[in-house]
Amino acid sequence: MKCLKTLLVSTTLLTAFSLNAEVTLEQQVKITEEGLHFDGRNLDFSNVGTPDTGEKYDYFFGPNISAHGDAVKTYRHYVFMTWYKGGKNERNVMLSRYNTLNGELSTIEFPHKHTGFRGDPLVGESHNTIGLSVSPINGTIHMVFDMHAYDNNNHGGKFKDDFFRYSFSVAGAAELPHSEFTLDKFVKDTSEVSQGDDDYKHLTMTGDLDDKGNFARLTYPKFFTTVDGTLLLYMRLGGNNNGAYVFNRYDAETESWSTFTKFNENNQKLKGNQYNWGLYGNMKYVNGKLRVGFQQRSNDNSDKYKYQNGVYYAYSDHPDGFGDWKNHKGEPMTWPLINSDEIKVFEPGDYISHTEANSVYIVGSFDWTVTEKGDIHIISKVRSTDRGRADYEEVYIHSYKPAGAEEFIISTDFPGASEIYTSGDNVYIVGLEGGRPYVEKAQGGTNNFIRVYEASDGPVFDHGTLYIKDGKVYYYLMERTSGTAMPLYLQIIDLDLESDANAPIVSFPSPSVTVNQGYEKLSLNISAESPVEGRSIQSVSLYIDDELVRTDDSLPFLFGHGSKPHETGALGWLDRHEPNPSPLSAGRHVFKAVAVDSEGDSSTATMILNVNSNAPIVSFPQESLEVDEGFERLSLNISAESAVEGRTIESVSLYIDGGLVRTDTSLPYLFGHASKPHETGAMGWLDTHSPNPSPLAAGSYEFTAVATDNEGEETTASMLLVVKGEPEPPIVTWPNSTVTVYEGYEKLAITIDAETPVEGRDIQSVTLFRNGELVRVDTRPVWNFGHSFAPYEFGAMGWLDRHEPNPSPLGVGTHTFTAVARDSAGLESETDMALIVLSLPGPSVMINEGDISLLTEYQNLAITAEASAADDDISLVSLALYIDEQLIREIYEPPFIWGSDAYSTELLSLTEGTHLVRVVATDSNNKQSESSIFINIDLLGDLNKDSIVDKADTRLFTSKLRAGEIMDIRYDFNGDGVVNNRDTRGLVRRCTYSRCSSN
């Protein structure tokens, strides 16, 4: 056992702040000699097709796969660890259990072997980690492993029905005796997609194959345990610049998992956002809540960020994260999130000066945590993309928000780290230095890290991953040796949280205070007491921005009182107070109180003082502006006003890259107006303007406005002007900007045209995206997609005998395909094609007759129709005749005739009035179409259309006869073959009322 007891002095606090800590290495145990490690070349897309076939194990992304990811967890007195077995030809998934009480080690070997990068076992992939958890409620073991955004179709279909890998044990397996801790305690897959009798991998976590779409395209499994023992799993859905975090929940009572729920939407552009984006960070369950912290990678390749930008943070007040999501200020956010700006904390890219496209590199050294009392800590790093540039910059950032504070404190006084952890109210940096573990500690809500543990002997480690539980670090490490099989160790390090419980309790009256510049008084009564009976507070020291103000050794611990008015930065408020010669300037200041008790234990509290400026308020119309080289006009109306009543603005001066342009002493403060068109670098735009002899050339320029008020106070504002020269990116085009197909289409192959207009350059790649999701990167011409070896790329079903039907064809709607061409200079162009998938049309059907008019007592009526299917592969099932929504008869083969032959009377019962006739055709796809006509049945004898036959009709009948109008032969009531006056008696007999002749 190794113990290092230290008393260290923080460089930021000089000699005033010390921290006692006794951190001990409790146990170290070797888990195996055979942890899989990739010892070969780091491949890329140019050589991944030719990996080493010998002993060396080439890899993609990184060399680590064992002791990597979510690979170590605890359950009661056991520590569980996952790993892959080395060497190169083994690769089995392994699970080890260490009994911390008796030192017993149990290991299970699973049949599954690491499948390698995109299914090539000769190329290792570091992203295919094994996530691990044990339910504290029922003792089931859960593992999700060996996947990187796979689905049924990508990578040539290599992962069909095997794109998600989940293994789980029976209840109670976690604490079985050593002899019973065996593979048979895990549940086999007996579903229809099982790969055999030794298949312990399940395609879904719900047990329902109908849910398999919910488990596709996932990466980076990580489990959490909530305060009530519920297991949660989170993973990343999708790709690097178009992704989402998803999570699900385990119900220990029913031993079942839910489907995945999204924290944020992917394909954000389709949902109204300006661009698609992915997440680089973590979802964590800390301090009793599910939380998310990440950096964003957008698909904008023309901004100053090479990959990621920003720091984003959110948390959920729902016990399991299913709703009630908020930003760090407690404001509700859209859930699932679409616009990441709703939860943005700050921009690390603002901490270096580069502005050119792809010049800022924010990758790695990002992590975050939250202490038990609610202090939020986020670490990040920003540097120049080009390490060789003369003005190379690199900044490590620690942003933290003490519990109760309203805003983050952003500190660049931070040496940097890759991960940050928490236990109790402290934050920790745990890592390797010279291959040996060390621990640094800071009180939550502070930036005061000191080293409390470091190993000076023992094995030299290559890397590791860790889990902290109940004040102990379970550090799972791989020893640095050689080959494709290297030893794995577990170290258990006690963080000595018990001593922290004895530390003093210290606090400011408020976590944050806002005052105006020139404030006269700020008195702070700092509360400090010991939680341990018999101890007393020896002193309280106040620091402002890490500078010691004073140490007070007696109650009350009051700073800024009448005898010391200046120590809190105030001017003074009594007549006897001389004005403070060094008052606090406008801006944010960190006040820190350090309490030390009679045993030498100490604690720290912080307060943020925001000092509002009295200086003028000045601003450009916008912070940055892009124009094309040779721009004709740039007029800038600079806003300037005093923040103090009674003061006025004396002048506003404009500078370009430090050179004075002009000082304006009267409103409006307008530069680049018609009388001075050249002063902002423009060419001029009026006929009276001669061309600018010295226009601003392509490049970036800093415009600075300096506003001065009548008291001589100044304020500066800046604007970045980017003058864009003519870029010459590749030219990429589709054969057609819009393609229309019918659902179920078998084939769609398209060759994309890509070329560079610049001599000496060539096209390096053409990348195809479907609705924002990566389809494939093609690195050699011709740029053909959807060909016979990749028939599904445009969503087609497949057309050759060897093509299995596409299980995920594109549905009805409009789909956007984006082609991105990249040339040898790194310039990119993109163009979109709209693929419109139409619903298969129903059959065509037509009633041959037009609208029909009949009289009651009609004797004959037949209706005929013709129909055909929309496609040769579709058959016609039936035609059905409806009259007034009443089915008359359905006919299953032509001829389609109603009212003839054996059915001659089926249409003879229509009553007086108008009837809707519909013929509905149905095809073998259950698609339907219809044709319709109207049949109008008039009352026989009702010549004036008043719905009765009466004397008026007989008179009209006689009148029509006299006028020689042709009458319907059905009015030949006496059957002599003509309609004449002798038929009047027959009409009278049809009168609606009796005694028609007397009406």
From Swiss-Prot:
Q: Which domain of life is it from?
A: Bacteria
What is one GO biological process annotated to this record? polysaccharide catabolic process
Cleaved signal peptide residues? 1-21
Q: Which residues bind substrate?
A: S126, H127, Y280, R297, Y361
Give residue numbers for the site Neutralizes the sugar carboxylate group at subsite +1. Answer: R236
EC number, as in UniProt: 4.2.2.-
> Could you tell me what this protein is called?
Ulvan lyase, long isoform
Entries under Gene3D superfamilies matching the protein: Dockerin domain, Immunoglobulins
Major enzyme class: lyase
- Similarity field: Belongs to the polysaccharide lyase 24 family.
Residues where Ca(2+) 2 binds: D300, D303, Y305
Q: What does this protein do?
A: Ulvan lyase involved in ulvan degradation. Ulvan is the main polysaccharide component of the Ulvales (green seaweed) cell wall. It is composed of disaccharide building blocks comprising 3-sulfated rhamnose (Rha3S) linked to D-glucuronic acid (GlcA), L-iduronic acid (IduA), or D-xylose (Xyl). Ulvan lyase catalyzes preferentially the endolytic cleavage of the glycosidic bond between Rha3S and the uronic acid GlcA, but not IduA, producing oligosaccharides that have unsaturated 4-deoxy-L-threo-hex-4-enopyranosiduronic acid (deltaUA) at the non-reducing end.
Q: Tell me which species this is from.
A: Alteromonas sp. (strain LOR)
